[in-house]
């Protein structure tokens, strides 16, 4: 098969980030082509927990989260999102973990996110199933959980109804001057936005991206055990750490009564097989925080690959040295939260508009000159 077609923007990748870019581009009146070799909303979007969270480990990360969470409000109204505002309860297992809580609460308040410190009594009032000996934590009431694959599907479906052209089941083989060549021989002409997560280096080999494998377990349905997304205070350190393999406590109640148990991180592991020893460590960590999980039956486990940059911030913006090539990828574990904001920032910049946030911290050029 061969042929040429011209488009205002060619978006490669239809995970949650790519799908959000498609929506923003179509809303701006662009003639959009979407290329997706696998399932829409597949990859990291399908493997993720679906936690909408104001992550405050880095000011640029937090700014992107807050901007994106505002833009999630419309998507959250869709039945496909399975949106549940369960809130996040950050749990301190050690007394010293409480030392930074007041500063975190203040930092969140500065960007309009309400959070409150809780002592041990308040912690157990919110979640009685926690193990004895916890010291307190932080409660962020407006955080939520969603089901990302169906959101991505709806975004692409609505975009196609509005005129976007979907090239499904075909791989983008190579970027060419002025467009992209597909594996079936067709050539799409126009500016290109690469949003393929861990696969970005296949088209942009000069852009560093590490695959960070994660595993999750889903339980059987059961009477309510937990009401909040529970995360240990040390989660951010594990998420941004450089350890080859790590686990941290992270459990999410799903709207249907199941529990989603995480999380693990492994760098540079390409096998899609479950890592039994790391899975055991992850479950033992969860049971140490919620002993009742020992009696809950696990239904299945799976893994996915987070696209990770060296500095923990995504790549958003034009690619230096390449004409009319843009990128939106590298969100690691925050792609679900950050998708709508990332998309709007990139499309605004593509159109020459002033984005709501400065793109400077996220520009891919930082990785090419060694800043990231």
Task: Give the predicted meaning of each segment.
Residues 10-12, 187-199, 343:
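Short hydrophobic core segments
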Residues 3-17, 33:
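Beta1/beta-strand and adjacent pyrophosphate-binding region of the FAD-binding site
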Residues 63, 91-100, 138-157, 273-278, ...:
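Short beta-strand to alpha-helix junction loop
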Residues 26-46:
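Glycine-rich FAD pyrophosphate-binding loop
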Residues 273, 280-281, 287-372:
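C-terminal catalytic lobe of FAD-dependent flavoproteins
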Residues 23-24, 52, 81-84, 187, ...:
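Active-site substrate-recognition segment that forms the wall
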Residues 138-181, 186, 190:
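Helical element adjacent to the flavin cofactor pocket in flavoenzyme catalytic cores
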Residues 49-126, 286-287:
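Dinucleotide-binding Rossmann-like beta1-alpha1 core, especially the glycine-rich loop
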């Amino acid at each position: 098969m061969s042929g040429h077609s011209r488009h205002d923007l060619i978006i490669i990748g239809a995970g949650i980030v790519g799908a959000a870019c498609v929506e923003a581009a179509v809303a701006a009146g662009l003639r959009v082509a979407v290329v997706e070799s696998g399932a829409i909303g597949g990859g990291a979007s399908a493997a993720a927990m679906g936690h909408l969270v104001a992550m405050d480990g880095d000011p640029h990360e937090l700014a992107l989260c807050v901007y994106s969470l505002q833009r999630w409000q419309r998507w959250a109204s869709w039945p496909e999102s399975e949106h549940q505002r369960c809130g996040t309860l950050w749990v301190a297992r050690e007394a010293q973990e409480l030392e930074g809580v007041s500063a975190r609460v203040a930092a969140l308040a500065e960007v309009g996110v309400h959070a409150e410190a809780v002592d041990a009594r308040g912690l157990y009032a919110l979640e009685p199933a926690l193990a004895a000996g916890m010291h307190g934590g932080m409660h962020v009431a407006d955080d939520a959980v969603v089901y990302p694959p169906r959101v991505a599907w709806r975004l692409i479906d609505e975009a196609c109804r509005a005129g976007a052209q979907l090239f499904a089941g075909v791989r983008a083989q190579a970027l060419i001057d002025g467009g992209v060549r597909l594996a079936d021989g067709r050539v799409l002409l126009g500016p290109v936005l690469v949003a393929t997560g861990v696969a970005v280096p296949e088209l942009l080999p000069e852009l560093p991206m590490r695959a960070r494998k994660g595993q999750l377990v889903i339980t059987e349905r059961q009477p309510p055990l937990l009401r909040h997304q529970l995360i240990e205070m040390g989660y951010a350190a594990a998420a941004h750490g450089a350890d080859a393999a790590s686990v941290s406590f992270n459990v999410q109640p799903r709207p249907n009564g199941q529990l989603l148990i995480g999380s693990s991180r492994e760098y540079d592991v390409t096998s899609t097989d479950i890592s039994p020893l790391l899975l055991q460590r992850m479950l033992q960590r969860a049971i140490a925080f919620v002993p009742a999980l020992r009696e809950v039956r696990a239904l299945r486990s799976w893994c996915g690959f987070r696209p990770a940059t060296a500095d923990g911030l995504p790549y958003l913006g034009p690619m230096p040295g390449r004409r009319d090539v843009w990128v939106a990828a590298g969100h690691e574990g925050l792609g679900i939260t950050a998708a709508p904001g990332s998309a709007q920032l990139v499309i605004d910049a593509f159109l020459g508009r002033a984005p709501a946030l400065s793109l400077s911290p996220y520009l891919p050029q930082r990785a090419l000159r060694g800043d990231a």
